[in-house]
């Protein structure tokens, strides 16, 4: 499929980007957001494998590729994944055009949560469709030192689908935490109570909309 894209320059690199997007570009290229992978990585003892989702157009996977030996990135939206695939050519990045959740299904992605047509960064699971959703536990991932999820309110379902991975490798976990989750029937408080009681993790840091959890 042909997508309308443009070339934008940031951090001494040309990026293939959705032509209509303004909001996500401004947000992700803001210094504090673009440097989030660096800040997170400083808390990780062993930088071998990071599992990151959603990958959007590749800014975070690109940064993580320079910080970890191997990166697994997930981006379900076709247009965003096309851009990610063009932007990320490093051999240590495994790119997956998949959504993450609790169990395998076929889903659709709704309009960006901001309701703005010039934002490609806010799509969320909105029902049945033709996009494949899988659980992390269904994959043969050989390790995980950091699990970073930014799924527009779908983070808890992805965590439930990664319990075996988390229990086996005990990675540092970073989640976007905001009220988007309420569209999917839960609150941040409920999710964090589950993280503490079931996964045996604790909150160790927070940056704006992102919360960091470490094993007890």
Region spans (language model):
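Conserved acidic-Pro-Pro-aromatic motif
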Residues: 48, 67-73, 138-216
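S-adenosyl-L-methionine
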Residues: 1-87, 91, 141, 188-191, ...
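Short, glycine/acidic-enriched loop or turn micro-motifs at the edges of active sites
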Residues: 55-57, 78, 100-102, 151-155, ...
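Soluble or luminal CAZymes and related metallo-dependent hydrolases
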Residues: 32, 76, 128-132, 154, ...
């Amino acid at each position: 499929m042909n997508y309308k894209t443009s070339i934008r320059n940031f951090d001494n690199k040309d990026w293939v980007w959705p032509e209509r997007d303004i909001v996500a570009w401004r947000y992700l290229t803001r210094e504090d957001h673009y440097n989030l992978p660096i800040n997170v990585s400083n808390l990780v003892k062993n930088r071998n494998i990071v599992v990151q989702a959603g990958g959007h157009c590749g800014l975070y996977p690109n940064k993580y590729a320079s910080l970890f030996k191997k990166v697994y990135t997930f981006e379900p939206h076709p247009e965003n994944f096309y851009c990610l695939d063009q932007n990320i050519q490093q051999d240590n990045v495994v790119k997956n055009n998949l959504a993450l959740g609790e169990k395998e299904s076929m889903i659709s992605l709704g309009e960006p949560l901001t309701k703005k047509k010039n934002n490609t960064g806010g799509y969320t699971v909105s029902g049945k469709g033709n996009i494949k959703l899988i659980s992390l536990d269904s994959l043969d991932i050989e390790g995980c030192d950091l699990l970073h999820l930014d799924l527009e309110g779908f983070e808890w379902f992805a965590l439930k689908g990664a319990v075996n991975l988390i229990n086996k490798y005990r990675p540092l976990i970073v989640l976007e935490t905001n009220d988007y989750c309420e569209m999917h029937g839960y609150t941040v408080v409920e999710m964090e109570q589950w993280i503490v009681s079931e996964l045996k993790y604790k909150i160790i840091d927070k940056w704006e909309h992102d919360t960091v959890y470490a094993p007890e």
